[in-house]
UniProtKB/Swiss-Prot annotation:
InterPro entries: NTF2-like_dom_sf (IPR032710), SEC_C_motif (IPR004027), UPF0225 (IPR023006), YchJ-like_M (IPR048469). HAMAP family: UPF0225. It comes from Cupriavidus pinatubonensis (strain JMP 134 / LMG 1197). This is UPF0225 protein Reut_A0143. Belongs to the UPF0225 family. Pfam families: SEC-C, YchJ_M-like.
């Protein structure tokens, strides 16, 4: 009689679009095992957090000066994909990421095209600086 192997857990692909498994990609940031090394990685992790309804991560990575008080998950939105168009770092503490996020609401498809601004700053005394989302300019949103 042969022993049966326990079923393997099916790896969950990361919604951020890099093609990696969630746990090894954005999941490590969401769990606090790692810090996103640049603004693009942070932006991808924020997109993934929106997909998964992880509003704690979205709030934690939003600069306090611009974070809305009423940040709630949007259960009507179904996120479909992310494409990063550009990532530019102006200096050690400022960067921009241009992206297109595709989504559906009520069966209608939309595209969110944004150029987001990020800053890198310490979260607490003695801790290394982290990237934070500040704001963004909509380049277009069309069906």
């Amino acid at each position: 009689m042969s022993a049966r192997r326990p079923p393997r857990a099916t790896p969950t692909p990361c919604p951020c679009g890099l093609g990696a498994e969630y746990d090894a990609c954005c999941g490590r940031y969401h769990r606090g095992d790692a810090v996103p090394p640049n603004a693009e990685a942070l932006m991808r992790s924020r997109y993934t957090a929106y997909v998964m309804g992880n509003m704690d991560w979205v709030r934690q990575t939003w600069h306090p000066s611009t974070c809305p008080a009423d940040l709630l998950p949007d259960t009507a939105t179904r996120w479909l994909g992310l494409s990063v168009k550009a990532h530019s770092q102006q200096d050690d503490t400022h960067a921009e990421v241009e992206f297109v996020a595709r989504y559906k609401v009520g069966g209608r498809a939309w595209r969110l095209h944004e150029r987001s601004r990020f800053v890198r700053e310490p979260r607490a005394a003695g801790e290394p600086p982290v990237w934070l989302y500040v704001d963004g300019d909509m380049i277009g949103e069309a069906s």
